[in-house]
Amino acid sequence: MALDGEAYQRAAAIFGETISALSDAEWELSVSDDWTVISTVAWVVVGDSQITNALHQGEIAPVSEFDAAVLGGNPVATWRGTAVAAIGALKSTGAAERVVKHPGGRFAVIDLLGQRVTENLVRAWDIGKAVGRPVDIPDDLADACLDFWAEHAEAVLAGGVLPDEPIEPPDDADAVTRLLALTGRA
């Protein structure tokens, strides 16, 4: 399975289902030491907006800082608008094959998709864990993400893409467990 527009749409749907089920009180729950549910959602929204920017403007701008205020008064609606725009942009012929500008050089949209599919899946899992409602990541999407990151080992080894110290999964771990371990989750 390729990490294409369809894979992004499936991963975004999982993320959307996860945040649509949140109660008002759950938005401020801690996801990790540095993240709350709302800051995690803002991070995904800002990241997913890069798909639309890449395809409509031909470039990806770096995201060094972000503010949860980007979500406005209705975080789910803001997420939905961003995801729908990205899905729409990906439906144009040859969208995933485009190469766009990036501060580090040229960047393939298909590589951005690999990052965004992974991000949507693991961030949904993070939020589900924080609120006590486990999120099921489909095995085929987890497998595809693992294949993607295996093909991008140099980026992983350069640092800043995945955690500096991934968790070692058990030898008999399934694809979902291995993906979570690769992204520093147990």
PLM-predicted stretches and their roles:
Residues 2-14, 21-31, 36, 53-71, ...:
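Structured surface interface patches that mediate subunit assembly and partner/cofactor docking
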